């Protein structure tokens, strides 16, 4: 019998260096009958069993004391279902042979994966509990075309790479194996001999759950059921909808006071969700929740792109959180990081011993700012991995929007690089053509497959058409963060009011390009870290003036065209920078009514008023929705404009960015009549000085600013007021 199997083959198989285990193991036809071969380290006796009757058909001979067995079942010509009775340490176990099952991946799936056009690669790759030929187990598939051998190791096989070597599908570079008995909740990894002969242990790129750091194994976990998208959630993302986003880092929004430990997904569902709803926000934006090894990356260096982090609970717990947000009327935005990944050796880096997911040349594949690796978007399987991930979060978790991080670093080859540190594209330019095509393709597929879900770009340059359709030469995003507006307005607000007259254009310049993109106005986490100070602490003056400046700024921001985004803590004017290792300073809201309560009430009222009046959001991206009334009064740092809805209804917004009240300030208006003050950031309700206009004011038929009718208002110090025209 030993003549049938070459000794070198047995040695290679046992040593874990044999790349084609199915050519040796399992059931094979021979002239003497059907031969069954098995590699079962530490076994002492093995029989082939008839499953229905339990009858022993043949005892396998031990050809190698390290666990290689073989035996012939005479007079049998056709393959049949069998089991193995194996004696380990004196105990008999009945097992199904993984090597009796045929190929797992269908030819069409293999072709689509190789072409990079499989819309949902996660349905094929990764670990999936399944039943094959009446046997329950898990099918594993991993793309590692340059590996010499790949095995599944885990809790079901003592983490022994000899026991379950996989089949290579050469046409696609995918290794596959069905392991009977492996089930949900068990840990696993892929052990491989890489292209260079080195032994590697890798987490599954397509794992749906993973261990919490510092452990790095993947978990067998069923594919989540699809989430049905509702019409209400679709409408909440549209261009004419009120969108006010509360940006949250789940690990530091609030912590347990006794041990500074995180809240769980379910605790966040019970605390964060009702708070955001009460505050009037329409959307929750989550900093990346993909599994990541380093807390200090805030999730922006993910190693488990398909796995919600276990820091706050299980995959099902995260689904519970999303469901709770939807039940409260909140859409959920997920920060998504397809731009780079960390160098940790258990993850994607040099996955099969080659630069499989990343570029081989560090001038293309290494991000020196973050010590991370850059995806090779030109490789079809890599692009497919990422596009499929976008669909996965939207379809399987009900994520309503993806905010794509660091788009500029993706689309420019020379991003943060000096001359000689980057490689031009094929036309000699600086654009990363493959990344641009990847983004366009992702946005196109999402638009086709999940109507109503949207994408938002954090893009820090003036790359044209980020939020324009692909057929117009754009990238196809629905929205783009307006970082220029954010920088200009914060630069203005930090100035002593006496100097603001010399920088008046920082508040007006944004309208010159406002309709080139569909903008979100962001005051994000990036603006309250790394020595930039908190938003409150950037405001000039004493404590009263700091809070007044902040309130005036928020009133301006909520009225300015564009959707709104505010990072957690800013809604109650946290005074210190954000610390990801600690809770927000909720104690500032303790001990009686104070300035922080005032800002919190203002943000709530801004949200509710903004949502109630269509003029404040319906035409954000249409020039008809905005008109300057006073734009050139730089000496007094006064700016006045109107917001307008589709029916022509107007809201007047007036800001005074000096501490000097402006009494009897007259300006021309479009619509005469009685105007009611609906919001005043200087109200005593917000701990202001309570200057204002007594509720209502009537227009005069006095020409001003080129208009026949005008209003005469009191403009409170360091304040913004909103007025709506009363019906006759």
From Swiss-Prot:
Pathway: Glycan biosynthesis; glycogen biosynthesis
Pfam family, one: GlgB_N
Keywords: Carbohydrate metabolism, Glycogen biosynthesis, Glycogen metabolism, Glycosyltransferase, Transferase
Keyword field contains Glycosyltransferase: yes
Gene Ontology annotations of biological process type: glycogen biosynthetic process
Active site as annotated: 405 (nucleophile), 458 (proton donor)
Keyword Transit peptide in annotation: no
InterPro entries reported in the protein's UniProt record: A-amylase/branching_C, Branching_enzy, GlgB, GlgB_N, GlgB_N_E_set_prok, Glyco_hydro_13_cat_dom, Glyco_hydro_13_N, Glyco_hydro_b
Family annotation (Gene3D superfamilies): Glycosidases (3.20.20.80), Golgi alpha-mannosidase II (2.60.40.1180), Immunoglobulins (2.60.40.10)
EC annotation from Swiss-Prot or TrEMBL: 2.4.1.18
Reaction catalysed by this enzyme: Transfers a segment of a (1->4)-alpha-D-glucan chain to a primary hydroxy group in a similar glucan chain
GO molecular function terms noted in the UniProt entry: 1,4-alpha-glucan branching enzyme activity; cation binding; hydrolase activity, hydrolyzing O-glycosyl compounds
GO cellular component: cytosol
Function statement: Catalyzes the formation of the alpha-1,6-glucosidic linkages in glycogen by scission of a 1,4-alpha-linked oligosaccharide from growing alpha-1,4-glucan chains and the subsequent attachment of the oligosaccharide to the alpha-1,6 position.
Family, per entry: Belongs to the glycosyl hydrolase 13 family. GlgB subfamily.
Assembly and oligomerization: Monomer.
Protein name as annotated: 1,4-alpha-glucan branching enzyme GlgB
Source species: Shigella flexneri
């Amino acid at each position: 019998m030993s003549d049938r199997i070459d000794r070198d083959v047995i040695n290679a198989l046992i040593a874990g260096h044999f790349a084609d285990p199915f050519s040796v193991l399992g059931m094979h036809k021979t002239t003497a009958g059907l031969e069954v071969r098995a590699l079962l380290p530490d076994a002492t006796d093995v029989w082939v069993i008839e499953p229905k009757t339990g009858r022993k058909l043949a005892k396998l001979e031990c050809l190698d004391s390290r666990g290689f067995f073989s035996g012939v079942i005479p007079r049998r010509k056709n393959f049949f279902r069998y089991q193995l009775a194996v004696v380990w340490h004196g105990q008999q176990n009945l097992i199904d042979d993984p090597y009796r099952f045929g190929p797992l991946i269908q030819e069409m799936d293999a072709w689509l994966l190789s072409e990079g056009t499989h819309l949902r690669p996660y349905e094929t790759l990764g670990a999936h509990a399944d039943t094959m030929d009446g046997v329950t187990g898990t099918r594993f598939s991993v793309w590692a075309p340059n590996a010499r051998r790949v095995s599944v190791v885990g809790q079901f096989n003592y983490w022994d790479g000899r026991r379950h070597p996989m089949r290579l599908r050469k046409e696609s570079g995918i290794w596959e194996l069905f392991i009977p008995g492996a089930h949900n909740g068990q840990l696993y990894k892929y052990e491989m001999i890489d292209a260079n002969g080195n032994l590697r242990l890798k987490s599954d790129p397509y794992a749906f759950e993973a261990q919490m750091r510092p452990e790095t194994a993947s978990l067998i976990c069923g594919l989540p059921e699809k989430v049905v998208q509702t019409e209400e959630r679709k409408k909440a993302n549209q261009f004419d909808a009120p969108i006010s986003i509360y940006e949250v880092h789940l690990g530091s929004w609030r912590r347990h006071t006794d041990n500074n430990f995180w809240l769980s997904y379910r605790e966040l569902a019970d605390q964060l969700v009702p708070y955001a709803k009460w505050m009037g926000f329409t959307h929750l934006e989550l900093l990346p929740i993909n599994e990541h090894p380093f807390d200090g990356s805030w999730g922006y260096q993910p190693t488990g792109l398909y796995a919600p982090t276990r820091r706050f609970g299980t995959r099902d717990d995260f689904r519970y959180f999303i469901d709770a947000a939807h039940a409260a009327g909140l859409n959920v935005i997920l920060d998504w990081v397809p731009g780079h990944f960390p160098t940790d050796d258990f993850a994607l880096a040099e996955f099969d011993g080659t630069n499989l997911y990343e570029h081989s040349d560090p001038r293309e594949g290494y991000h020196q700012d973050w010590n991370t690796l850059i995806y090779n978007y030109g490789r079809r399987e890599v692009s497919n991995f990422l596009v499929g991930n976008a669909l996965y979060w939207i379809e399987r978790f009900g994520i309503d929007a993806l905010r794509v991080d660091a788009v500029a670093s993706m689309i420019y080859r020379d991003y943060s690089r000096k001359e000689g540190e980057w490689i031009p594209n094929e036309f000699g330019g600086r654009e990363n053509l493959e990344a641009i095509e990847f983004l366009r393709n992702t946005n196109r597929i999402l638009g086709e497959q999940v109507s109503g879900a949207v994408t938002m770009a954090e893009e820090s340059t003036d790359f044209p058409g980020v939020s324009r359709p692909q057929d117009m030469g754009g990238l196809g995003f629905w929205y783009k963060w307006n970082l220029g507006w954010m920088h200009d307005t914060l630069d203005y607000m930090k100035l002593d009011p006496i100097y603001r007259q010399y920088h008046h254009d920082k508040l007006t310049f944004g309208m010159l390009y406002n309709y080139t993109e569909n903008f979100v106005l962001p005051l994000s986490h990036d603006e309250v870290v790394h020595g930039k100070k908190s938003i409150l602490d950037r405001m000039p003056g004493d404590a009263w003036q700091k809070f007044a400046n902040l309130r005036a700024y928020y009133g301006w921001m909520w009225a300015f065209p564009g959707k709104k985004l505010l990072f957690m803590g800013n809604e109650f004017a946290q005074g210190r920078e954000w610390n990801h290792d600690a809770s927000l300073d909720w104690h500032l809201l303790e001990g009686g009514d104070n300035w922080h309560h005032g800002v919190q009430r203002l943000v709530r009222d801004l949200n509710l008023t903004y949502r109630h009046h269509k003029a404040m959001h319906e035409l954000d991206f249409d020039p008809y929705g905005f008109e300057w009334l006073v734009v050139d009064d730089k000496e007094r740092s006064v700016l006045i404009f109107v917001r307008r809805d589709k029916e022509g209804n107007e809201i007047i917004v007036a800001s005074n960015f000096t501490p000097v009240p402006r009494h009897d300030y007259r300006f021309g208006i479009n619509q005469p009549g009685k105007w009611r003050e609906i919001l005043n950031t200087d109200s005593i309700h917000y701990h202001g000085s309570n200057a204002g206009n007594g509720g209502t004011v009537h227009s005069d038929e006095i020409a001003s600013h080129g208009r026949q009718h005008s209003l005469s208002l009191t403009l409170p110090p360091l304040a913004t007021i909103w007025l709506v025209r009363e019906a006759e």
